[in-house]
Amino acid sequence: MTKLEQDLVAMLTPAVEMLGFELHGLEFVQAGRHSTLRVYITHEAGISVDNCADASRQISAILDVEDPITNEYDLEVSSPGVDRLLFKQDHYEQAQGEEVQLRTKLPQDGRRNFKGDLIAVTSDMITLSSDGTEHLIMLSNIERANIIAKF
């Protein structure tokens, strides 16, 4: 997570929680001159479109006042979905036994992309079983990870 993303999480979490939701995570994606801030919210009863609209208004008001992003950007607020991104250690713990795909920041075992079953989680590492091989991957080396939805 970048410094900007960390600052945004700290800034937005209280407002999201005040609405009764949990800030699952966020990502700031830049593609040339176009940027998108994606904020994922959760609730044990699920998230509706109205919930996303309420959270979007609250988040937008905070961002307008604090102005942490200097360039133009689009704000998207949604539930994490069935193929949810994994941001925090407890997300990985909840996903144990699930199939996940991930990309590491630095190459590991000669590659950066992995897909397999998440079989163990510790405070700083996960174990991923892929094609009969177990890979120990530091949480700090994971750039992006998500659950693979099964239908």
Curated annotation (Swiss-Prot):
GO terms for cellular component: cytosol. This is Ribosome maturation factor RimP. One of its GO terms (biological process) is ribosomal small subunit assembly. Transmembrane segments: none annotated. It holds the Pfam family DUF150_C. Keywords: Cytoplasm, Ribosome biogenesis. It is found in: Cytoplasm. The keyword Repeat does not apply. Coiled coil: none annotated. HAMAP family: RimP. Belongs to the RimP family. It comes from Pseudoalteromonas translucida (strain TAC 125).
